[in-house]
Amino acid sequence: MTKILGSDLIKRGMAQMQKGGVIMDVVSAEQARIAEAAGAVAVMALERVPSDIRAAGGVARMANTAIVREVMEAVSIPVMAKARIGHIVEARVLEAMGVDYIDESEVLTPADEKFHLLKSDYTVPFVCGCRDLGEALRRIGEGASMLRTKGEPGTGNVVEAVRHLRKVNAQLRKVINMSHDELMTEAKHLGAPFELLLQIKTLGKLPVVNFAAGGIATPADAALMMELGADGVFVGSGIFKSENPEKFAKAIVQATTHYQDYDLIARLSADLGEPMRGLEISELAVQDRMQERGW
């Protein structure tokens, strides 16, 4: 029996449809409905948001399928779910359930420290994290249809997301301005497929969308990432760990859409209540930095 796979064009096109929007982490049908009402373009179904995963420690796995199913039945917008890096069966289970996207995520404890999933072998599109252009292109080479910065999830601290997005964009500009005869050496340096560098040179951009994620906690954070060139934002703990999730959700969506309307962002930021409590990145031990997972 011939396996039917989704084409890159279709998978990447689905991701393009989320461009300019906000994708929110949710752990229940109620939260999913709040996210949809606030204007989220998609939701990520989890058992625990990243800050709770970080606090609990231990091994973080794919969410209980009952939670994923509950979220899928609660909303009409696309539903994403996370699988562990390299965990073939978690990804196959989520695909069989009919989720719209799978996030091969460093937020969960990696199942394989050497190999990422061969995402081109799945019908469902994948989103993956990256810290630099080399990571981005390796994931695209494996079949990722959408990228996001890794940032440092569950911290409410946007500094790492800023660092990663700026680095990817700086490396993109370098590749775009290279002559063709320099691309093979750069591909070797980045540890990335030559064909993808050639594609970037031709297109003048990444072949897939790149969202910002990891530490976005306020409307201003979301607007900052859009200002820096993100195609949209993921918000993990920032909404449902804030004092007023409904207000924060709506404000972050509006700030993402109107990221250069600073008067509006000022008004959106008033009377929101307390944002989630933030963590200083330098206080995290290396083994506690989720961004270090994967390669």
Curated annotation (Swiss-Prot):
Keyword RNA-binding belongs to the record: no
Transmembrane among keywords: no
Gene3D superfamilies in the cross-refs: Aldolase class I
GO MF terms, alphabetically ordered: pyridoxal 5'-phosphate synthase (glutamine hydrolysing) activity
Superkingdom, taxonomy of origin: Bacteria
Pathways per UniProt: Cofactor biosynthesis; pyridoxal 5'-phosphate biosynthesis
Binding-site list for D-glyceraldehyde 3-phosphate: R166
Coiled coil residues, start to end: none
Active site per database record: K82 (schiff-base intermediate with d-ribose 5-phosphate)
Enzyme class at the top of the EC tree: lyase
Signal peptide residues on this chain, from the entry's feature table: none
Binding-site residues for D-ribose 5-phosphate, renumbered to this chain: D25, G154, G215, G236, S237
Keywords: Lyase, Pyridoxal phosphate, Schiff base
Catalysed reactions, as listed in the record: aldehydo-D-ribose 5-phosphate + D-glyceraldehyde 3-phosphate + L-glutamine = pyridoxal 5'-phosphate + L-glutamate + phosphate + 3 H2O + H(+)
Enzyme Commission (EC) number: 4.3.3.6
GO-annotated biological processes: amino acid metabolic process; pyridoxal phosphate biosynthetic process; pyridoxine biosynthetic process
HAMAP family reported in the protein's UniProt record: PdxS
Quaternary organization: In the presence of PdxT, forms a dodecamer of heterodimers.
PANTHER family linked: PYRIDOXAL 5'-PHOSPHATE SYNTHASE SUBUNIT SNZ1-RELATED
UniProt record similarity statement: Belongs to the PdxS/SNZ family.
Function: Catalyzes the formation of pyridoxal 5'-phosphate from ribose 5-phosphate (RBP), glyceraldehyde 3-phosphate (G3P) and ammonia. The ammonia is provided by the PdxT subunit. Can also use ribulose 5-phosphate and dihydroxyacetone phosphate as substrates, resulting from enzyme-catalyzed isomerization of RBP and G3P, respectively.
The protein, known as: Pyridoxal 5'-phosphate synthase subunit PdxS
Source organism (scientific name): Actinobacillus pleuropneumoniae serotype 3 (strain JL03)
